[in-house]
Amino acid sequence: MGEETINSTQNKTRTKTTRPKAVYLWTVSDVLKWYRRHCGEYTQYEQLFAQHDITGRALLRITDSSLQRMGVTDNRDREAIWREIVKQRLKTDIMEIRDMERLNIY
């Protein structure tokens, strides 16, 4: 999350939090950064995400069998990586629902 300083009319300084970039807009580099943060103990598979050009949009569509086809053959490792992907998918869904509620779009 980014932060920017805003000066109000009363010369009080407050901090406004900006939203992170939407996962759908992530580049391969963004996905690799996410991978290192959330799946850092499985470094042996990190390059598979780069080799397969996994962007944010692709990350949210990955399935267990996709991971296996990519080369994540160890069942436990694949399950752990898949769990992190599902968590990210849920976070993305929650943010979208909140946006719709905020804008009263149903």
From Swiss-Prot:
Domain of life, source organism: Eukaryota
Membrane topology: Peripheral membrane protein
GO BP annotations listed: cell surface receptor protein tyrosine kinase signaling pathway; compound eye cone cell differentiation; compound eye photoreceptor cell differentiation; epidermal growth factor receptor signaling pathway; eye photoreceptor cell differentiation; positive regulation of ERK1 and ERK2 cascade; positive regulation of Ras protein signal transduction; visual perception
Primary location class: cytoplasm
PROSITE patterns: SAM_DOMAIN
Every SAM domain range: 26-91
InterPro entries found in the cross-reference section: Aveugle-like_SAM_dom (IPR039144), SAM (IPR001660), SAM/pointed_sf (IPR013761), SAM_domain-containing_protein (IPR052268)
Subcellular localization: Cytoplasm; Membrane
Keyword Nucleotide-binding listed: no
Tagged with keyword Membrane: yes
Sample GO molecular function, one term: scaffold protein binding
Annotated Gene Ontology cellular component terms: cytoplasm; cytoplasmic side of plasma membrane; cytosol
Keywords: Cytoplasm, Membrane, Sensory transduction, Vision
Pfam families reported for this sequence: SAM_2
Function: Required for normal photoreceptor differentiation between Ras and Raf for EGFR signaling in the eye and for mitogen-activated protein kinase phosphorylation. Probably acts together with Cnk to promote Raf activation, perhaps by recruiting an activating kinase.
Classification via PANTHER family: PROTEIN AVEUGLE (PTHR20843:SF0), STERILE ALPHA MOTIF DOMAIN CONTAINING PROTEIN 10 (PTHR20843)
Subunit structure: Interacts with the SAM domain of cnk.
Remarks, miscellaneous: 'Aveugle' means 'blind' in French.
Protein name as catalogued: Protein aveugle
Species of origin: Drosophila melanogaster (Fruit fly)
Gene assigned in the entry: ave
